[in-house]
Amino acid sequence: MSMLNTWVGYLSLLLFAIAYILIIFEEKIHLKKSKPIVLVGCLMWLFIGIYERMHGGEHGGGAHEFVEHLIAEIGGLFFFLLVAMTYVNTLTSLNVFQALRAWLLSKGMGFKSLFWATGTLTFFLSPLADNLTSALLMSTVAFAVGDGNKKFIVPAFVNIVVAANAGGAWSPFGDITTLMVWTAGKVHTLEFVYLILPSIVNWLIPAFIMSLFIPKGKPEAKKEVMAMKPGARRTMVCFILTIATGVSFHQFLHLPPFMGMMCGLGYLMFTSFYMKRWGIKKYLKKLGLEEDRREIDRADIFKQVERVEFDTLLFFFGVLTAVGALQYIGFLKIVGGGFYDFTGFTTANTSIGIFSAIVDNIPIMFAVLNMDLSMELDQWLLVTLTCGVGGSLLSIGSAAGVAVMGINRENYTFMAHLKWAPVIFLGYLGSIVTWWVVTMALR
């Protein structure tokens, strides 16, 4: 018996819609986005369980097996993100990103040079540090040197958001959606190379047009001294080795990549242990200073784990749990199958990118992955691209955009970003045309 036309189906759909309305208005009602979706996701499975108990074997009683498979998938992604976030927090605590910011501020560049510098650094930082971190870092730089100049700050912020999302689209580690596609085995590590040119085009078209409106002149050079703390370079090496280990587990050993990432967390744990026992002591001795246990902020890996953004991780859990329930009930097969059958793969995957600017791209990508679609590699590349860069169309369409809005709410608003939406859409279309050209050999 199908659950689609039962009270479980209707109630689950209603609860999912309510949860998403609360998520959309997170900033207005000051309710963390993880709270409604975690509750709703678990309630949906509660109702499914009650329904199966009431009807005995009529539905097959497969919820237990389905949830076990779902949790294995969620758990792998959860631990992967936990390690990545811990590394980013550790690098931040060691002043790696702050040192980069200080270096940029000291260069005394003109507004136009800063526009291109922040955009370029964001684009190439996103594949490693993720699009949210890179957008936050570069937007603080742009704001610091902007001197309140709205004509510079708004296009610079828009450029950073577009560059962050475009940069994250061509790497398994750049965005949660690309990570999901990669761990699902739909696009392998080296196959992401096909998305480099489309991602560059997606960023460069709006960046070039916006650069024509950047005011001439040069902001006052800021003298900010910020040195990296002891252990920063070792941690950066560990981060690179961790990514290599995660890729190797997935690509060559055919084991879940989160195991490689957890192995990398072990690298970081032993590095921090070394710094705690000997590194800081050597550093202070070199400076001719005495060690003061009360004053020294010792390298402690568990402090960085505590600082992980658990709201994001729990939101991720809630979304995947809720979408998994919709899949089990049968909604995804009907909605997804009908949409793709009616429009075709290319049109559907292009539309999904636009839709992801309105609704969070994580549930959209998870839904696509669970629709049992028989798409070839070129189409999986397209939906990976569009789901990653489509959020740039609106300021609230991506985590990077929402975070950057918090840097300067007075100037960078929803409407300020919307004014540049036609230009961003040109980049979106340009990236799809580029995708079509670079993947011709795959068809």
Where are these regions (language model features)?
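Interfacial loop-to-helix junctions that mark the boundaries of transmembrane helices
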Residues: M1-V8, I29-S34, G60-G75, T189-P198, ...
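Re-entrant/interfacial helical elements at transmembrane boundaries that shape
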Residues: T133-A144, F157-V158, S171-G185, I334-G337, ...
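Membrane-core helix-loop-helix motifs of multi-pass transport proteins
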Residues: G148-I240, A244-F252, A403-T434
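Membrane-embedded alpha-helical segments and adjacent helix-loop junctions characteristic
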Residues: E58-V154, E306-S374
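Hydrophobic core segments of alpha-helical transmembrane domains in multi-pass membrane transport
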Residues: S12-I24, V40-G49, L81-N89, L121-F123, ...
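Structural signature of hydrophobic alpha-helical transmembrane segments
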Residues: M3-L15, A72-V83, S126-A135, L195-P206, ...
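Hydrophobic transmembrane alpha-helices of multi-pass solute/ion transporters
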Residues: L13-T86, A99-W103, K107, M262-T321, ...
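C-terminal transmembrane helix pair
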Residues: V193-S199, T347-R443
